């Protein structure tokens, strides 16, 4: 039999001839597998299960030869096994003896002797088996020498296992143990959710019962207290009424007596009686006259004036009027004095009336548009409606009946009943988002505790649509109708219509993989093709096959409906005709160099020259929107009363809800509203009264480079589909106009047909983690509508493996299952889980919450730049930006979460309040992932190590040419707003790498290279972290010329 070393060389040689390649670890794996197999067929079957070898022909012959060559301990029978075999034979023999007939005494004695001897042999066999198992375990732990030798004797190992087998078995045992822990954790989470749901209902019922009891008690007490007062009031009213009635009766009685007995002589008693009645009547009249005189005098007294003011005809901007800018009062006084000095009256001012708009319509500023095409509408308007029609709407039910989807209500419900999956095509504003869920609710799809889910790609859309539907149904938002977005849940156990972002529905699959509590799932705005929408398509398609009673509706705005139908196994398409008026499209004669300035000029140009109607402007992001609004307000302020009032209203995702709602308010008479929005207004929102649309032709898109791991949010030209959607916003209520700030040639030749799906241009770490949590392991063959690049998918798997979320077989680990429960980036999840090890979870929660508010903590007013920068520097702490964020939140919490503190320190209160909400939700999820709360008590080294445990992938070190990432060797730069911008530490960790003017590192943290080996020894090697410039030359004593010879 060959030695282990010789056998390994033989396997390597054979692998060359069979596979064309050879590797030492593969040879050791094959030898170890052959040693564990009891037969050659079992060995062949195990190799076939790996799906790496084609076991036909030479490969099968090689496997059989290898199994015959591999030494096995079962060849020579050990003495212990022989003794066990003899004892088993004796036991069988004794059993056969028991069946013979014999006297009871002799039989009992024989059985007793046999039993006693059998017990001794059993003890001996038990001892031998235990000893043999210990010897085998010792044999497996020993290493294989270069030249193995056979040993004699049953107590010595015959062969020694190779090192790779021991490592493989240990890894396999750890993998199986981790899988058991993961499944146990998932079961605990599921049971905890179940218990919590039941407790919520019980608490709700108990609370409702207590509230009703309290209400009844208060009603009884109020009734007892009110009855005496009501009696007094009723008595007084009755007395006044009785007085009037008695006086009327007395006057009637006197009139009758005068008419009947006026000419008759009366007795003395009758005359006295008549005189008494007249006296009583006169006194009553005098009393009434005195009361009326007192009331008349009371009306002549001074009374405090009552509130009689109505709605102002001109909108008042409180922020503008209460402006506290330096010198504001002096500026107003000077303007008033100058205005009084140059005041003119009458016809002398007529000559200056003609060029009153010269600041807007100067020739060098005016943008010339050319009418190119017209989008035909379905209806011809009789006349342009006045803006006041928005204030004179019908009731909510009348508005519902006026929507284009209403005439097709019965047909739509019949199509939903007859088909499991239905594609709905309809224009934005046709009512499919708000009305179809209500139709399904009225039809009874929410009976027996079932719910209807409607997904939206954006948070703002989910919140605004839910509020609108709640008003139409006459219920409070959060009861029957609610919404669920990231870090905010406005639902209850009574919610049956649930609007949510598509990412939140994906997270529902974790706790309810079959969506058993939903009867209908509606994926709205499917044409936007967001990352989560594409993942939802694959999952819902699979769930629909498993649950035939589940209804799936895919709503799209006239784009890609045929492709959606093909993807869902040729599902039928239900088309809702849109109510759209003609739209004239205008292009510029020449390209515009600065589209932001062109937008501002065009808005004023439309405002001055065009008939009444609101304006919708599309810009790329919050910064551009705020800049455009500021420019418009400044120019309108300079023009003053020369132009009509122009209301400038922004709309973007981070805007507070109350300010978002302003765009839906009716425009005051005599004014014009301009809404400056991102592409959220393309399809997700419908704003009434829009007649004019300004389209610069740009949008912001996130792109991801898997080779460098860098994300960039760049301004890119929009697609033709998006441009047509924007133009369609102008034809909602009347014939409109769309002004495109680019040429017709650019539209035809420079714009893409459709937008690239987000799944093909973003990082997939969260998606891979979620799909793995749902038990989907074969990601390469997952049913994507548009598959992502394999390079991006492989990088996501590599990152999750480095973070410990996946094992070497690509299976989800216990840590990965916990990371999937946290609705944040995988690196941020790893940082939160690692905080338990370093006892700093309180601080890490704060850092994670502050990192989740999109770098919008500080603000710099243009007139107070120096003060804002000084306030920011006051928060700096040694160590990096993460500790600065922690310091800001800590001081804000110590101030009692004060908004005044934020104003004084140039911190955005809205962002801090959102960070507090995020922290509270993450703190609630810590119990779910079984992480305890702890604080480091100011030991920031532990905080920095916990952050390093999650973001060791994002590290850079200082070289002679600047900062370079450790792995990719990419040149990067510290962002100028960082607290470490001037310090330049040798080793850095960054939160994200963004491409703007340069490759900037945002939110950097100073670390030590030894921490990387501590938290990620599997990812970094000591040689990679050595600094070649820090090495010193060895000290050596020089020699003289004589010594050198």
Curated annotation (Swiss-Prot):
GO terms for molecular function: ATP binding; ATP hydrolysis activity; helicase activity; molecular adaptor activity; pattern recognition receptor activity; RNA binding; RNA helicase activity; ubiquitin binding. Residues 602-775 form the Helicase C-terminal domain. InterPro entries: DEAD-box_helicase_OB_fold, DEAD/DEAH_box_helicase_dom, DNA/RNA_helicase_DEAH_CS, HA2_WH, Helicase-assoc_dom, Helicase_ATP-bd, Helicase_C-like, P-loop_NTPase. Residues 101-211, 1026-1045 are annotated as: Disordered. It catalyses: ATP + H2O = ADP + phosphate + H(+). Residues 413-577 form the Helicase ATP-binding domain. It is found in: Nucleus; Nucleus, Nucleoplasm; Cytoplasm. Component of pre-catalytic spliceosome complexes. Component of the minor spliceosome, which splices U12-type introns. Interacts with GPKOW. Interacts with TRIM6. Interacts with RIGI. Required for pre-mRNA splicing as a component of the spliceosome. Contributes to pre-mRNA splicing after spliceosome formation and prior to the first transesterification reaction. As a component of the minor spliceosome, involved in the splicing of U12-type introns in pre-mRNAs. Also plays a role in innate antiviral response by acting as a pattern recognition receptor sensing splicing signals in viral RNA. This is Pre-mRNA-splicing factor ATP-dependent RNA helicase DHX16. It comes from Sus scrofa.
């Amino acid at each position: 039999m060959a030695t282990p070393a010789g056998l390994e060389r033989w396997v390597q040689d054979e692998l060359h001839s069979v596979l064309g390649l050879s590797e030492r670890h593969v040879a050791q794996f094959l030898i170890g597998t052959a040693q564990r197999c009891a037969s050659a067929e079992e060995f062949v079957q195990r190799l076939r299960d790996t799906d790496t070898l084609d076991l036909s022909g030479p490969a099968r012959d090689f496997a059989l030869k290898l199994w015959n060559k591999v030494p096995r301990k079962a060849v020579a029978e050990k003495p212990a096994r022989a003794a066990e075999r003899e004892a088993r034979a004796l036991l069988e023999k004794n059993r056969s003896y028991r069946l013979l007939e014999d006297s009871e005494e002799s039989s009992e004695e024989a059985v007793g002797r046999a039993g006693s001897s059998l017990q001794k042999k059993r003890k001996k066999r038990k001892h031998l088996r235990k000893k043999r198992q210990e010897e085998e375990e010792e044999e497996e732990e020993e290493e294989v020498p270069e030249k193995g030798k056979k040993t004699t004797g049953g107590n010595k190992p015959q062969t020694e296992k190779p090192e790779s087998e021991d490592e493989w078995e240990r890894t396999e045992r750890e993998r199986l143990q981790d899988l058991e822990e993961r499944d146990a954790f998932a079961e605990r989470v599921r049971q905890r959710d179940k218990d919590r749901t039941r407790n919520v209902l019980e608490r709700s019922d108990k609370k409702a019962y207590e509230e009703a009891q309290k209400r009844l008690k208060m009603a009884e007490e109020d009734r007892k207290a009110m009855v005496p007062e009501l009696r007094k009031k009723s008595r007084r009213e009755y007395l006044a009424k009785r007085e009037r009635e008695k006086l009327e009766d007395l006057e009637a009685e006197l009139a009758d007596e005068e008419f009947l007995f006026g000419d008759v002589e009366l007795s003395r008693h009758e005359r006295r009686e008549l005189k008494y009645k007249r006296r009583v009547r006169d006194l009553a009249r005098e009393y009434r006259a005195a009361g009326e005189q007192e009331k008349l005098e009371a009306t002549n007294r001074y009374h405090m004036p009552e509130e009689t003011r109505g709605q102002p005809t001109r909108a008042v901007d409180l922020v503008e009027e209460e402006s506290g800018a330096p010198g504001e009062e002096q500026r107003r006084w000077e303007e008033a004095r100058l205005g009084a000095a140059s005041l003119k009256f009458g016809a002398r001012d007529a000559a200056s009336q003609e060029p009153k708009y010269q600041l807007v319509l100067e020739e060098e500023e005016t943008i010339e548009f050319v009418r190119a095409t017209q989008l035909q509408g379905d209806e011809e308007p009789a006349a342009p409606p006045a803006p006041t029609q928005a204030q004179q709407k019908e009731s909510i039910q009348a508005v519902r009946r006026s929507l284009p989807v209403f005439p097709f209500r019965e047909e739509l419900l019949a199509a939903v009943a007859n088909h499991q999956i239905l594609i709905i095509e309809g224009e934005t504003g046709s009512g499919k988002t708000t009305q179809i869920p209500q139709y399904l609710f009225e039809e009874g799809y929410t009976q027996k505790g079932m719910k209807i889910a409607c997904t939206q790609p954006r948070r703002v859309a989910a919140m605004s649509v839910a509020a609108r539907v709640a008003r139409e149904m006459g219920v409070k938002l959060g009861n029957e109708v609610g919404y669920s977005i990231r870090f905010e849940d406005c639902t209850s156990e009574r919610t049956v219509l649930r609007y949510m972002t598509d990412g939140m529905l994906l997270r529902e699959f974790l706790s309810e993989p079959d969506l058993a509590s939903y009867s209908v799932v509606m994926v709205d705005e499917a044409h936007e093709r967001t990352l989560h929408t594409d993942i939802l398509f694959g999952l819902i398609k699979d769930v629909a096959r498993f649950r035939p009673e589940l209804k799936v509706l895919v709503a799209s705005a006239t784009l890609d409906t045929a492709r959606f139908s093909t993807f869902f196994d040729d599902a039928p398409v239900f088309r809702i005709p849109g109510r759209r008026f003609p739209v004239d499209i205008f292009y510029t004669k020449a390209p515009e160099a600065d589209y932001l300035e062109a937008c501002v000029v065009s808005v004023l140009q439309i405002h001055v020259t065009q008939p009444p109607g609101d304006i919708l402007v599309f810009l790329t992001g919050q910064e551009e929107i705020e800049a455009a609004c500021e420019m418009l307000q400044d120019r309108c302020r300079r023009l003053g009363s020369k132009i009509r009032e122009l209301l400038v209203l922004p709309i973007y995702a981070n805007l507070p809800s109350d300010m978002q709602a302003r765009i839906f308010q009716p425009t005051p008479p005599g004014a014009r509203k301009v809404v400056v929005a991102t592409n959220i207004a393309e399809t997700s929102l419908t704003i009434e009264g829009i007649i004019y649309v300004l389209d610069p032709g740009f949008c912001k898109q996130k792109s991801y480079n898997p080779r460098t791991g860098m994300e960039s949010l760049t301004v890119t030209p929009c697609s033709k589909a998006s441009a047509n959607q924007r133009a369609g916003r102008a034809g909602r209520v009347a014939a409109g106009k769309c002004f495109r700030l680019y040429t017709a040639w650019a539209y035809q030749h420079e714009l893409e047909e459709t937008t690239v799906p987000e799944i093909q241009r973003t990082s997939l770490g969260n998606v891979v983690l979620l799909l793995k949590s749902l038990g989907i392991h074969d990601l390469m063959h997952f049913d994507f509508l548009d598959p992502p690049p394999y390079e991006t998918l492989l990088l996501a798997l590599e990152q999750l493996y480095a973070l410990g979320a996946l094992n070497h077989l690509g299976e989800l680990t216990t840590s990965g299952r916990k990371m999937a429960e946290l609705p944040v980036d995988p690196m941020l999840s790893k940082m939160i889980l690692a905080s338990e090890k370093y006892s700093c979870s309180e601080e890490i929660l704060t850092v994670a919450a502050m990192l989740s508010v999109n770098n919008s903590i500080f603000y710099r007013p243009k007139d107070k730049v120096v003060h804002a920068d000084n306030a920011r520097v006051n928060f700096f702490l040694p160590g990096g930006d993460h500790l600065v964020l922690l310091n800001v939140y800590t001081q804000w919490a110590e101030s009692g979460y004060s908004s005044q503190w934020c104003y004084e320190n140039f911190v955005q209160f809205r962002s801090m309040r959102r960070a507090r909400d995020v922290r509270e939700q993450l703190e609630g999820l810590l119990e779910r992932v079984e992480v305890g709360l702890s604080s480091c008590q100011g030991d920031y080294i532990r905080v920095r190590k916990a952050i390093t445990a999650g973001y060791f992938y994002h590290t850079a070190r200082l070289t002679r040419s600047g900062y370079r990432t450790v792995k990719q060797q990419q040149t990067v730069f510290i962002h100028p707003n960082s607290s470490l911008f001037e310090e330049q530490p040798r080793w850095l960790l960054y939160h994200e790498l963004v491409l703007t003017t340069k490759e900037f590192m945002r939110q950097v943290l100073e670390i030590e290279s030894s921490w990387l080996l501590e938290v990620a020894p599997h990812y970094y090697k000591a040689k990679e972290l050595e600094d070649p410039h820090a090495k010193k030359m060895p000290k050596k004593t020089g020699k003289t010329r004589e010594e050198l010879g």
